[in-house]
Amino acid sequence: MALLVWQEYTEKLYKKDLHNPDNHDDVITNLEPDILESEVKRALESITTNKASGGDGIPVELFQILKDAAVKVLHSICQQIWKTQQWPQDWKRSVFIPIPKKGNAKECSKYRTISLTSHASKVMLKILQARLQQYMNRELPDALGVELGYLF
């Protein structure tokens, strides 16, 4: 199928109505503490190996081989993102891979898509996820009277 057809299909499939990303009127200025190298290391160690790389082509195994050097570089980048609230443009991009479903796969809707995201971006996402989880564990059980993970 033509590249343009796939581009239009995935844009329509994943399009969301989001607020203007350039409008920072409601930005929180007093953020949580700085990101720690230990958070970066923990996030990096938690990323599954033997997975396809994102658009940057950097496999997670390279970060894991470089160990402390990679942690220091990723920590610096993650800290910059945390302070400026600006996500690198390359980290916002994903590569979509169509995988045919059973049957006749002549239409885009007969495929499922997976998205390949930069492993460096995943490190920051895992840090944010861990911080949100800690916050929710700390705040929500008191408010809701339930423990996360045991809602249903």
Please report, for each region that a protein language model flagged, where it lies by residue:
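Surface-exposed loop/turn segments and immediately adjacent short secondary-structure elements
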Residues: 1-110, 115, 119-123
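Electropositive, glycine- and tryptophan-enriched low-complexity nucleic-acid-binding patches
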Residues: 125-126, 133-149
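Short, compositionally biased segments
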Residues: 2-6, 144-152
